[in-house]
A protein has these predicted regions:
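Extracellular beta-strand/beta-solenoid scaffold signature
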Residues: 131-132, 170-182, 201-217, 226-229, ...
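Right-handed parallel beta-helix/beta-spiral solenoid domain characteristic of secreted/periplasmic
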Residues: 5-17, 53-82, 87, 92, ...
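All-beta strand scaffolds that present successive hydrophobic residues in beta-strands
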Residues: 52-55, 69-83, 102, 161, ...
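Flexible, charged surface loops at secondary-structure boundaries
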Residues: 23-29, 45-48, 139, 148-155, ...
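Acidic Gly/Asp/Thr-rich repetitive segments characteristic of extracellular carbohydrate-active
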Residues: 3-32, 108-160
Length: 553
């Protein structure tokens, strides 16, 4: 570039005049712009429509409000090539000094750095500002759509992450809402080297905002984020892995979204709703998404793993490891949102393959009511992370105002209280919205003084159709107050509970379609009170007594 007249690259003299004069020559000769090492001060706008190669040490320095637009290829490695004064934390909607329309971009171009050893994360500079700058390079300036919405200037390219750990001292936001205006993004996303290779390490463990990584207000073109991890860590804190943030990652108010191979960990601060629902500490919160697909998500050492609120989403393969309350929840569990009991969201979710290991409560938890789900391949192992003790309370939990319908199938081993409990006011299905359960349950070890079962349905409005294989259980198979439910049961080594019965039916109707109960230790097949139990006559025998309580039929 120094071949061009008036291109000095000393960081003092304005090189914009020389570069603008040199570009037409390069276009006519079908040549690229080659920038050799030096500081190129730019005080006037430049638009470059040909490829640009930055040799290491070549840095463009826009000042005086100048904007540079790159409409073709940028050839540069993982080193700094832009020196800008943009502050998108102070003014996220401000004009950007650099616009890149032609290629994917790198945070390193704006000064981000990585380190291989996370324990030395504080030895490198904070990359937060570089991430804001590289994102705004992909959006250009925000342009008005109407009086309440602005949109990125062009379709965004992706941000390419390198191997290693990025130090992030501040949150990362993308689309946002400010002063009554939505600033939306059109396409773009992130592509990393793999969820264990490209890692954003957030160090502000005392931060209690909504999220560390917020990708919201995306629309029109496809948005794709794949192949990286977000985590919380600061070696100077008493607990270096304990973050108080509402969620590690938040994806909100977006359509056309793909989230693949993403790993989140470290959100550990619980805050209770007035009704006792435990929120906070979300690994990934999905909020108000349409046309969303996901694949290979890993959430570990959080309070709530993944949560869905007002989403239409389809995906495969979620892994939850050592999360305190849930691995897969429904509702918005970020504390700044209204209490779960006040949320009126609706989810339509399909997932194949959900693995839970060492969850401390209920791996699958329905906090809100209108959840229509198809979940297959749910695999739960309730043993602790570092021992054989059982820590998982129950496979499926429902809040006092929560509910679910659709179908769920899977296997759960080593739980304390079995499969599901509607706690009397939650909805495990409802009229016209049956919940279909098909499960293999093995190893139920809890004990309780009052009536309690592997399937515990005490809300008369719940409606279930259950196929259950149950073995090695200290609790009976089912307690039902449901007005109408059905059960097909195969059981082995199942205790009879307080009524010494495999099944208890109270204040409702239960149809048993099939029963294989060889080897169980209960004294009675069923106890029926204020309800009707219907089953094929062939099931009843001298060894299968049914005891009728008051008004039992």
């Amino acid at each position: 570039a120094k071949e061009g007249e008036n291109i000095i690259a000393d960081g003092v003299n304005n090189d914009a005049v020389g570069i603008n004069a040199f570009l037409p020559v390069l276009v006519d000769e079908n040549r690229e712009l080659l920038l050799v090492p030096g500081i190129y001060l730019v005080n006037d706008d430049i638009t470059i429509d040909i490829p640009v190669t930055f040799q290491p040490g070549a840095i463009i320095k826009p000042r005086n409000g100048a904007q540079l637009t790159f409409n073709s290829e940028i050839r540069a490695g993982c080193y700094k090539i832009f020196d800008t004064e943009d502050d998108f934390y102070a003014e996220p909607e401000a004009k950007t000094s650099i616009k890149i329309t032609g290629v994917n971009v790198r945070p390193e171009w704006f000064g981000a750095t990585t380190i291989s050893d996370v324990n030395a994360i504080l030895n490198i500079a904070d990359s937060s500002s570089a991430f804001r700058k590289v994102f705004r390079a992909t959006t250009g300036d925000f342009k008005p759509i109407n009086s309440t919405s602005y949109r990125s200037e062009f379709i965004c390219k992706k941000i390419e992450l390198s191997n290693g750990h990025y130090r992030m001292d501040k949150p990362t936001t993308h689309g946002f809402y400010k002063n009554g205006i939505f600033y939306k993004i059109d396409g773009g996303g992130y592509t990393g080297k793999g969820m264990g290779n490209s890692i954003l390490v957030y160090t502000a463990l005392q931060y209690e905002g909504n999220s560390f990584f917020d990708f919201s207000y995306g629309s029109w073109e496809m948005h794709e984020l794949t192949g990286f991890k977000c985590t919380a860590y600061n070696p100077l804190e008493d607990d270096p892995y304990y973050a108080r943030v509402g969620a590690i990652m938040l994806f909100g108010s977006t359509d056309s979204l793909i989230t693949n191979e993403i790993w989140a960990s470290g959100a550990k601060y619980i805050r209770n709703d007035p009704d006792g629902t435990r929120r906070g500490g979300v690994g990934i919160q999905f909020e108000s998404l349409v046309d969303h697909s996901f694949c290979n998500l890993l959430i570990e050492h959080c309070i709530n793993g993944i949560a869905f609120s007002s989403c239409i989403s389809t995906g495969v393969n979620i892994k939850g490891f050592s999360n305190t309350i849930s691995d897969f929840a429904f509702g918005n569990f970020i504390p700044e949102w209204p209490p779960v009991s006040e949320q009126t969201t609706s989810n339509i979710i399909s997932i194949s393959g959900l693995e839970s290991k060492a969850c401390g409560a209920t791996p699958l938890f329905f906090g809100t009511n209108e959840n229509n789900v198809v979940i297959t391949g749910l695999l739960i192992d309730g043993r602790a992370e570092a021992s054989l003790s059982t820590v998982t309370y129950q496979a499926i939990g429902i809040s006092k105002s929560g509910g679910v319908h659709g179908s769920i199938s899977g296997i759960a081993v080593n739980t304390n209280y079995g499969l599901i409990d509607d706690i009397g006011t939650g909805s495990a299905g409802s009229t016209g919205k049956t919940l279909y359960l098909n499960f293999v349950i093995s190893g139920v070890y809890g004990s309780i003084g009052s009536e309690f079962s592997v399937i515990n349905i005490t809300n008369p409005q719940s409606r279930l159709n259950v196929i259950l294989s149950l073995s090695n259980s200290s609790l009976p198979a089912m307690l039902s107050y449901s007005s109408y439910s059905t059960l097909s049961l195969s059981s082995l080594h199942v205790d009879g509970g307080t009524q010494d019965a495999l099944i208890e039916v109270k204040s409702g109707n239960l149809i048993i379609n099939s029963l294989d109960d060889s080897g169980s230790t209960y004294g009675k097949l069923a106890y029926v009170e204020d309800s009707v139990l219907i089953m094929p006559a062939i099931i009843i025998s001298t060894n299968r007594n049914i005891i009728k309580g008051a008004n039992g039929v």
